[in-house]
Regions:
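Sec/Tat signal peptide C-region and signal peptidase I cleavage site
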Residues: 20-26
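Flexible hinge/capping segments at coil-to-helix
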Residues: 129-146
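A ligand-binding cleft/hinge motif common to bilobed small-molecule-binding domains
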Residues: 85-89, 103-111, 157-161
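Bacterial N-terminal signal peptides
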Residues: 10-19
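Bacterial N-terminal signal peptides that target proteins for export
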Residues: 1-11
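Ligand-binding "clamshell"
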Residues: 107-118, 164-166
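Ligand-binding cleft/hinge of the Venus flytrap
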Residues: 50-54, 66-75, 137, 155-172
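Extracytoplasmic small-molecule ligand-binding "clamshell" domains
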Residues: 27-102
Length: 173
């Protein structure tokens, strides 16, 4: 049967960006200022939020917000590249001061970290080639259809719930 790559782009719930942080304490902020740098964990490849432009420079919405925060603090920005699954561990281990990513604040994540106010809200969508025979979620929810989503993400969770008959393939990002 025909397989397609299906990207579930956005989770329909809040996508919080840029200020996932441990409880903000005065000593942590003073440590950042004394150190002279804000260490920010970003996705190695998270287009729109964090990616390399054609000149090889890291950019994206989350990166630009992190730059602004470092500028406001008067410190150097140090971006640290991680795969998706390494973002929260980098924060919890103290390697990073914050995470800048499009991360939905799930109960499991909120039990470990604090989230900023959301920068935007997004609906869940499916993306298929223009000439695809699939025109609805119902048509994708069939045996023999393979969909893809970012592993360990709310995209994957939405895919499992909305397309239980399809095969979900999770990708790192």
């Amino acid at each position: 049967m025909r397989k397609i790559k299906q990207w579930l782009a956005a989770a329909g719930t809040v996508l919080a960006v840029a200020a996932i942080a441990q409880p903000a304490r005065a000593d942590e902020l003073s440590d950042i200022i004394k150190r002279g740098e804000l260490r920010v964990a970003v996705q190695t490849s998270g287009p729109l939020m964090s990616f390399m432009d054609k000149s090889g420079k890291r950019t994206g919405l989350a990166v630009e917000v992190a730059k602004r925060m470092a500028d406001d603090l008067g410190v150097k920005l140090v971006l640290q590249d991680y795969e998706w699954k390494g973002l929260i561990p980098a924060l919890l281990s103290g390697k990073a001061d914050m995470v800048a990513a499009d991360m939905t604040p799930t109960p499991q994540r909120a039990a470990q970290v604090l989230f900023s106010a959301p920068m935007f809200y997004a609906d869940t969508v499916a993306v298929v080639p223009k000439d695809s025979p699939y025109k609805s979620y119902a048509e994708l929810n069939k045996d023999g259809v393979t969909v893809g989503a970012l592993g360990a993400s709310t995209y994957a969770e939405v895919g499992k719930k909305m397309l239980p008959k399809a095969t979900l393939k999770e990708f790192s990002g």
